Amino acid sequence: TTEIEPLTQKSLFNARKQVNKIHMSEAVEEYLVQLILATRNSRAYSGELGQWLDYGASPRATIALDKCSRALAWMEGRDFVTPDDIRAVAHDVLRHRLILSFEAEAGGINANQVIDKLLETVPSA
């Protein structure tokens, strides 16, 4: 059997430094920002999104989406973020940060479905 060694504080801090160095191109960064903006001004992007969202994601969601997509790229051995990285973490990052409308909830629409529509609506880099 393989012995698992505990994670040290030093190795955790080193990993954090490496993740922060992961490159995100301007085009990919713009895609990330547009996803967040689409939650705040949803009617401009899609009538359905406009009906489903009362409140969109906060500035902290932008930061979390950025950090999580960089971390995923790092864990996959890349030194750059792709739109696929952003899409891969979007549900986990945004699910609890969106306030759905009464219409959405009454219609059986959940946050995952709203995020699916968001990813389908906002063009990627």
Question: Could you describe each region identified by the protein language model?
Answer:
Residues 1-44:
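Phosphate-sensing "switch" segment of ASCE/P-loop ATPases
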Residues 17, 41-125:
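C-terminal engagement/docking regions of AAA+ P-loop ATPases
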